[in-house]
């Protein structure tokens, strides 16, 4: 309230005892109010008491008035709020009653309409009746195919109308012409990158209405019963009609000029009128009438769609005509390079060109011949045969479908003629098998080779088991195993079309597509031959490529192997073929099936990537192409950083150098920098395009003297391809030179800078780093880098020491050839026992005692630290995971049995066992089977018989992965040992989120929830479940996260 003013204050008598005395002396009628200023409304008043006994209390009465006024105001406010809420509830109740009433009316209407339709379709077939019901339902008021009804209040607008979507969105790629109802569908289409202009179904919407056509007289019928009546009436005419003549089901209509498909004839006519497509692309008669929609049978529609899908297409830039192979590449191109241009889709054929296959001029049913032109039709008609003619495109399509469905494949038309692609499986003929005195195999597909010799000699005994053999004579227990071996031996893998990464497992590739490319590219990968650098789309095509261009592992076959001779024949043959895997097959083991076409004794090798080629032309083309080798080609003139792609250089200059682009050309093979692209290309052509050599094969089929005999190493092969011990220094140098780049490429060995934490996979990169970054610190007297082991991270001063360390400590023996029976495997060290058995059969005389002693010593160590034939999980594959769990099966062997459900996707389980524990996989556990099937479980080879061997292995591999994996991937160790707490403290120093869980203190559901919460990036701690558990793992986990948070805050404050 405002200030009452001086005039009102003056009229108030003073307070206190003096005021009371003066008030009693004066008369009430003598009181006057004097005002000097302008009149104002009276804001306060004085309660005048008539009684002399009562004392006026101005302040007390004013306080009571204010309090009463405030309470009344609050009461009125509450009353208004309650009234407003009551009205709101009443309105909602009325709306709900209206919705319920409308829903009941709709249900009653549908029920009545359904009863009416059931009476109408009693005489129709089930399929036709169901289709009519769907058509009638779509015509009803209410739900629509182009309307959105989410069940919320937005669906019901004023007047009970339903919200409808806006105008369909057109794909921004030119010539794609696909439309979508909303942006989400368009985004999925863009990610799938299916912009083929040769797609006749883009205008095919809604249900397909069936009608029936006669393939003899080309008449159309609405129902199937009318067609049957037509056949009964025309059977006696003997003009081709018969009771067995199947009708052609008309499901859609095609535009006569562009052959786009439409659900109804009205839609097709509307399209023809809009596009002015009243001209026929194929004229089969002189009739000059107006073109009309072509009735397209179901068989022709499926055939046209299938042929159009096989038509390759490309998406190119309108400005620079660069081919764009993915949505990611397209987006990056138009963001960096051609910002004012657009993409266009180009197909090798148009729909009209594909539809030309349906054009047939005549058909003779007597001799089953098809005629494609008028001359051949008339010539054959003169012979007296009755020919069915097609005078329009519609009649030609009906005749085509009648011929194709009547005889597959047709004799002359070859409608389904596809390239004869051979399978990898062969079937031996009876003549060949009898000539070799062996049992006739059950399967063998002929690939154009007339004779197949060298089959395994097996006597006709029983019982027999089925086995699969590769061309290299290795035996496998299943067809999947031998096919996987053929793919691996021929360097076949899968290549991602989006980013170009390669992988040997299709499951890993699909996981890569799902994780890194949004899930829309699950099938957007190709088959890639690393030897020939060739991309093929289909699996059958890659098989044909293996058969034509490769040798040694081109096929496999199936045979009935005698069970009795398995123990005698298989160990020696398996070891022999095992030792000769990387060498040309012996003439005793495998006979050359095509000696006339056999390649020369030698191959060409590229010195840059060490890939081998069959001819000089192939290796020359490989070296001439800049895309064959991946190296840095561009350099920033500001900071001398190098890049693979020019787009990356542009982004670098925009971010780091204020969009000032200064580019130079850099040769990553020899570290030279050029100012112009012509100089770089000239340098590459002169020096690197001819960097290949011819590698001759020393082995010969006929050996005349002992001097011509090459020393054959008889020791066992290691997992890297080298031998366990060598008798010849030349063989050792060759194998080590071949093995070292492979170890560096796979990350088994790597270079580490001595001055900083930089790493590299080859000498060139580490030397470049030392020269550019540590120019001032470089000294010729001391080495600026060390070579570290990728498994135990031990450092060495030279590559030879590091390679020898890897062979001694981490290279396991290769697994011998798989046999169905698996004889002589009683030892717990299966691989070492099998390898020693092979050495026993193939060992040379006792002149090699020194090598035997060395081999025996290494063999004893390997029996304790043996790694099976499988390699450790690939680091690139582990980078795709969201959680790495190390399980100590010595402490908790029933890990999978305690899990109540599946773990989150991206959780990788790495199991360890040691001591006397003999952990067996729970084959009946669904969680274990699922993780094994998707490749998210790996059982580490038995460490040793020491009690703490598994703990040491966990620490070693966890430390190795901590250096190689991104820091956001958490590690969890499931073990009851308290020694891992120190490992957790070490991980804190490296900023790695790590958790140590004791499985003995956790229930299965609690542990599963903890593991899933760790892998979830948006996890929140469940404080309710763990509030009463004092000292529980959940509290330890929460405390650990608090400590990490405090440490991060402290570190950030120090930096500030």
Curated annotation (Swiss-Prot):
CDD domains (UniProt xref): PIN_ZNF451-like
Ranges for region Sufficient for E3 SUMO-protein ligase activity: 1-246
GO CC, one annotated term: PML body
Ranges where the record places region Disordered: 1-39, 806-830, 839-858, 1019-1045
Annotated Pfam families: PIN_11, Zf-C2H2_ZNF451, Zf-C2H2_ZNF451_1st, Zf-C2H2_ZNF451_2nd, Zf-C2H2_ZNF451_5th, Zf-C2H2_ZNF451_6th, Zf-C2H2_ZNF451_C
Crosslinked positions (Glycyl lysine isopeptide (Lys-Gly) (interchain with G-Cter in SUMO1)): 704
Region of interest (Important for interaction with SMAD4), ranges: 168-521
EC nos: 2.3.2.-
Modification sites for Phosphoserine: 155, 429
UniProt KW Phosphoprotein keyword: yes
Enzyme class, UniProt record, top EC level: transferase
Span list, region Important for ubiquitin binding: 1045-1056
Region entry Interaction with SUMO2 2, spans: 42-50
Listed Basic and acidic residues bias regions: 849-858, 1033-1045
Sequence position, cross-link Glycyl lysine isopeptide (Lys-Gly) (interchain with G-Cter in SUMO2): 75, 77, 106, 139, 153, 167, 270, 275, 283, 288, 301, 309, 420, 431, 539, 583, 645, 704, 729, 746, 788, 815, 843, 849, 947, 988-989
Alphabetically ordered keywords of this record: DNA-binding, Isopeptide bond, Metal-binding, Methylation, Nucleus, Phosphoprotein, Repeat, Transcription, Transcription regulation, Transferase, Ubl conjugation, Ubl conjugation pathway, Zinc, Zinc-finger
Region described as Interaction with SUMO2 1: 30-37
GO biological process, one term: protein sumoylation
Record's comment on post-translational modification: Sumoylated. Predominantly sumoylated on the N-terminal region that is important for interaction with SUMO1 and SUMO2. Sumoylation is important for localization in nuclear granules; desumoylation leads to diffuse nucleoplasmic location. Autosumoylated (in vitro). Sumoylation enhances E3 SUMO-protein ligase activity.
Zn finger region (C2H2-type): 169-195, 212-234, 253-277, 315-338, 362-385, 494-517, 527-550, 604-629, 634-657, 665-688, 751-774, 787-810
Cellular localisation: Nucleus; Nucleus, PML body; Nucleus, Nucleoplasm
Motif PLRP, residue range(s) on this chain: 38-41
Region annotation Important for interaction with SUMO1 and SUMO2: where it falls in the sequence: 1-344
PANTHER family: E3 SUMO-PROTEIN LIGASE ZNF451 (PTHR24408:SF61), ZINC FINGER PROTEIN (PTHR24408)
Domain writeup: Binds UBE2I/UBC9 and two SUMO2 molecules via its N-terminus. The most N-terminal region interacts with the SUMO2 chain that is covalently bound to the UBE2I/UBC9 active site, while the second region interacts with another SUMO2 that is non-covalently associated with the same UBE2I/UBC9 chain.
Protein name: E3 SUMO-protein ligase ZNF451
Taxon lineage: Eukaryota, Metazoa, Chordata, Craniata, Vertebrata
């Amino acid at each position: 309230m405002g200030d009452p003013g001086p005039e009102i204050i003056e009229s108030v008598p003073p307070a206190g005892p003096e005021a009371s005395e003066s008030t009693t002396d004066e008369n009430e009628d003598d009181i006057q109010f004097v005002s000097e200023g302008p009149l104002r409304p009276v804001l306060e008043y004085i309660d005048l008491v008539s009684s002399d006994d009562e004392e006026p209390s101005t302040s007390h009465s004013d306080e009571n008035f204010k309090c009463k006024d405030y309470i009344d105001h609050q009461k009125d406010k509450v009353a208004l709020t309650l009234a407003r809420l009551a009205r709101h509830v009443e309105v909602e109740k009325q709306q709900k009653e209206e919705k319920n009433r409308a829903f009941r009316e709709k249900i009653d209407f549908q029920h009545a309409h359904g009863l009416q339709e059931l009476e109408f379709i009693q005489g129709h077939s089930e399929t036709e009746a169901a289709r009519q019901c769907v058509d009638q339902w779509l015509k009803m008021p209410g739900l629509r195919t182009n309307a959105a009804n989410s069940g919320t209040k937005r669906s019901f607008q004023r007047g009970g109308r339903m919200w409808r979507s806006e105008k369909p969105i057109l794909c921004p790629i030119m010539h794609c012409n696909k439309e979508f109802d909303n942006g989400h569908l368009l985004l999925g289409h863009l990610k799938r990158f299916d912009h083929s202009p040769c797609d006749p179904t883009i205008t095919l919407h809604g249900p397909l209405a069936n009608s029936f056509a006669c393939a003899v007289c080309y008449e159309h019928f609405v129902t199937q019963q009318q067609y049957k009546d037509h056949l009964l009436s025309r059977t006696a005419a003997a003009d081709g009609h018969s009771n067995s003549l199947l009708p052609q089901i008309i499901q859609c209509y095609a535009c006569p000029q562009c052959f786009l498909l439409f659900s109804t004839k009205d839609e097709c006519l509307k399209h023809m009128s809009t596009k002015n497509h009243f001209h026929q692309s194929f004229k089969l008669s002189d009739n000059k009438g107006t073109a009309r929609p072509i009735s397209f049978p179901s068989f022709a529609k499926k055939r046209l769609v299938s042929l159009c899908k096989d038509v390759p297409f490309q998406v190119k830039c309108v400005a620079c005509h660069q081919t764009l192979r993915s949505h990611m590449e397209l987006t990056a191109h138009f963001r960096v390079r051609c910002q004012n241009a657009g993409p266009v889709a180009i197909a090798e054929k148009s729909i009209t060109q594909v539809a030309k296959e349906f054009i047939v001029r005549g058909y003779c049913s007597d001799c089953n011949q098809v005629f494609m032109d008028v001359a051949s039709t008339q010539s054959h008609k003169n012979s007296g045969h009755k020919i069915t003619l097609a005078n329009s495109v519609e009649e030609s399509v009906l005749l085509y479908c009648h011929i194709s469905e009547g005889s597959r494949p047709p004799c002359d038309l070859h409608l389904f003629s596809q390239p004869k692609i051979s399978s990898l499986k062969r079937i031996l003929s009876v003549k060949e098998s009898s000539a070799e005195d062996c049992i006739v195999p059950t399967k063998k597909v002929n690939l154009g080779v007339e004779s197949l010799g060298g089959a395994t000699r097996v006597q006709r005994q029983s019982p027999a088991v089925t086995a699969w053999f590769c061309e290299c004579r290795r035996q496998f227990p299943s067809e999947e195993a031998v096919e996987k071996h053929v793919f691996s031996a021929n360097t076949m893998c899968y290549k991602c079309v989006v980013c170009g990464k390669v992988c040997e497992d299709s499951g890993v590739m699909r996981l890569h597509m799902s994780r890194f490319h949004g899930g829309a590219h699950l099938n957007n990968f190709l088959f890639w031959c690393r030897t020939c650098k060739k991309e093929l789309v289909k699996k059958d095509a890659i098989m044909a490529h293996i058969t034509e261009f490769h040798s040694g592992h081109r096929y496999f076959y199936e045979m009935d192997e005698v069970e009795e001779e398995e123990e005698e024949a298989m160990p020696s043959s398996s070891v022999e073929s095992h030792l000769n895997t990387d060498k040309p097959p012996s003439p005793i083991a495998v006979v050359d099936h095509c000696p006339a076409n056999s390649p020369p004794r030698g191959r060409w090798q590229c010195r840059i990537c060490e890939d081998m080629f069959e001819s000089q032309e192939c290796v020359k083309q490989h070296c001439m192409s800049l895309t064959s080798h991946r190296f840095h080609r561009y350099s920033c003139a500001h900071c001398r950083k190098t890049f693979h792609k020019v787009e990356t250089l542009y982004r670098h200059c925009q971010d780091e150098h204020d969009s000032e682009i200064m580019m130079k050309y850099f040769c990553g093979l020899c570290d030279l920098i050029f100012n112009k692209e012509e100089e770089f290309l000239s340098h590459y052509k002169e020096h690197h395009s001819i960097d290949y050599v011819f590698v001759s094969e020393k082995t010969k089929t006929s050996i005349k003297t002992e001097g011509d005999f090459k020393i054959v190493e008889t020791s066992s092969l290691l997992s890297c391809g080298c031998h366990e011990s060598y008798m010849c220094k030349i063989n050792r140098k060759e194998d080590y030179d071949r093995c070292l780049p492979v170890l560096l490429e796979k990350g088994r060995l790597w270079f580490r800078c001595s001055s900083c934490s930089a790493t590299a996979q080859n000498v060139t990169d580490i030397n470049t780093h030392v020269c550019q970054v540590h120019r001032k610190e470089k000294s010729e007297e001391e080495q600026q880098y060390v070579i570290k082991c990728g498994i135990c991270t031990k450092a060495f001063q030279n590559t030879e020491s590091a390679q020898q360390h890897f062979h001694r400590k981490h290279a396991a023996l290769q697994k011998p050839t798989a046999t169905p029976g698996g004889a002589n495997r009683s030892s717990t060290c299966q691989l070492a026992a099998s390898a020693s058995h092979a050495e026993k059969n193939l060992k040379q005389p006792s002149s090699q005692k020194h090598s035997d002693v060395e081999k025996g010593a290494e063999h004893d160590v390997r029996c304790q630290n043996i790694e099976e034939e499988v390699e450790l999980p690939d680091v690139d594959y582990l980078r795709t995971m969201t959680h790495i769990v190390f399980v100590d099966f010595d402490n908790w062997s029933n890990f999978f049995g305690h899990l109540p459900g599946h773990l989150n996707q991206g959780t990788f389980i790495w199991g360890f066992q040691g001591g006397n524990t003999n952990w067996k996989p729970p084959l009946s556990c669904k969680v274990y089977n699922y993780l094994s099937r998707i490749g998210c479980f790996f059982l580490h080879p038995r460490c040793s018989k020491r009690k703490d061997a598994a703990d040491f292995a966990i620490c070693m591999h966890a430390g190795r992965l901590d250096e190689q994996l991104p820091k956001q991937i958490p590690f969890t160790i499931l073990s009851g040992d308290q020694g891992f707490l120190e490992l957790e403290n070490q991980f804190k120093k490296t900023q790695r989120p790590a958790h140590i869980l004791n499985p003995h203190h956790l229930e299965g559901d609690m542990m599963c929830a903890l593991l899933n919460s760790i892998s979830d990036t948006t996890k929140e701690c469940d404080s309710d479940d763990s509030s009463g558990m004092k000292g529980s793992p959940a509290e330890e986990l929460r405390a650990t996260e608090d400590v990490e948070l405090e440490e991060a805050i402290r570190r950030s404050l120090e930096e500030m």
